């Protein structure tokens, strides 16, 4: 929750809960309640660990791994292209202290806003505390930058301006558009209309979680952003849960969030895909093709888990499905020789 991503989701959920008269959760507590149902992120993280431990390289990734193993000069060429590191005299503790300042200040401001009443902390709007936490971390980072060697003052502010500009051109614009769409959807009362349609055709509510997961994934894949999927589908998922089964609220929220993250991970036009490829020094197409099978397998396992939970209402059974799916992933794929 201590991120712009978390703040946006929590703020959106809080407003939707208030509009729908849903009093079981605040935006923050609703966000936390959805964590146990985040089947896709859990599966993806565990799959990363299993892939590393058991060297499960599938699809084009197997080809790229074999290619670099056969010719180490390819890796050496990449290393030569990397920019030369400069000795700045700044300890690695600078990063740790900066991150800690963000967390500590954010938590302090949450407690402050709650009047030091710990029981009310989860009901607070995290947006303002997160702003002060980010501002504090920025000031701390500037302090470390000023003490660094071989780093000029103009370079520091140029880097800060580039970071602000990148956010303004991408994340801020996406947020504004998402809020516009979200407001339009609420004015149209789309969630209630969908709920009425489900009831009129006797559509089983047990499959709603997996449907929301797949729709969010497809939407984020097509648009290249999870933020837009959040803004469009959360205003549908919340009133849908209120109208059909309020106890399904956490799992529906998790399905939307997890599906949007899956689509964002998989999309060739996603900023995360571009940044990952750039950071790894890989071509965008090669990165997209090589990571897609892993994301699809994780999404398939997560979809089955949502389906099983919707049919049974048992979280442990959904976890069992995830465990079986990951076990089959390891058993049915071949290890890549070291």
Q: In which residue ranges do the predicted regions lie?
A:
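Membrane-interfacial loop-to-helix junctions in multi-pass transporters
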Residues: 37-39, 92, 130-131, 164-172, ...
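Transmembrane helix boundary and interhelical junction motifs in multipass membrane proteins
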Residues: 1-9, 224-236, 268-272
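Hydrophobic transmembrane alpha-helices of multi-pass small-molecule transporters
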Residues: 39-41, 52-53, 69-180, 297-338
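Helix-loop-helix module between adjacent transmembrane segments
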Residues: 1-4, 38-41, 178-186, 219-225, ...
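Short helical (or helix-break) motifs at transmembrane helix termini and adjacent helical loops
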Residues: 260-275
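Hydrophobic alpha-helical transmembrane segments of multi-pass integral membrane proteins
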Residues: 172-178, 202-240, 244, 249, ...
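Membrane-core helix-loop-helix motifs of multi-pass transport proteins
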Residues: 1-70, 86-93, 273-329
């Amino acid at each position: 929750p201590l991120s712009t991503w978390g703040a946006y989701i929590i703020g959106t959920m809080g407003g939707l809960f208030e509009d729908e008269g849903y009093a079981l959760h605040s935006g923050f507590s609703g966000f936390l309640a959805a964590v146990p149902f985040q089947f896709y992120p859990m599966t993806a993280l565990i799959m990363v660990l299993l892939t590393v431990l058991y060297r499960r390289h599938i699809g084009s990734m197997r080809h790229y791994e074999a290619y670099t193993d056969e010719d180490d000069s390819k890796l050496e060429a990449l290393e030569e292209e990397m920019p030369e590191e400069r000795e700045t005299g700044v300890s690695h503790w600078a990063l740790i202290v900066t991150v800690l300042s963000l967390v500590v200040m954010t938590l302090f401001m949450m407690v402050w806003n709650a009047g030091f009443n710990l029981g009310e902390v989860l009901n607070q709007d995290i947006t303002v505390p997160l702003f002060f936490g980010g501002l504090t971390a920025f000031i701390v980072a500037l302090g470390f930058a000023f003490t660094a060697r071989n780093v000029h003052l103009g370079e520091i502010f140029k880097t800060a301006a580039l970071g602000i500009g990148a956010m303004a051109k991408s994340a801020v614009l996406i947020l504004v558009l998402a809020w516009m769409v979200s407001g339009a959807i609420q004015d149209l009362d789309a969630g209630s209309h969908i709920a009425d349609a489900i009831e009129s055709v006797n559509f089983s509510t047990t499959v709603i979680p997996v449907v929301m997961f797949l729709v969010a994934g497809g939407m984020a894949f097509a648009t290249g952003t999870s933020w837009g999927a959040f803004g469009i589908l959360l205003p549908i998922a919340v009133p849908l849960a209120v109208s059909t089964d309020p106890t399904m609220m956490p799992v529906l929220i998790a399905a939307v969030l997890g599906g949007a993250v899956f689509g964002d991970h998989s999309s060739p036009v996603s900023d995360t895909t571009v940044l990952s490829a750039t950071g790894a020094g890989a071509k965008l197409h090669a990165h997209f093709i090589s990571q897609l099978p892993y994301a699809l397998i994780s999404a398939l396992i997560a979809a089955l888990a949502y389906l099983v939970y919707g049919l049974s209402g048992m979280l442990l059974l959904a976890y069992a499905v995830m465990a079986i799916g990951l076990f089959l992933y390891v058993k049915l794929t071949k290890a890549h020789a070291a």
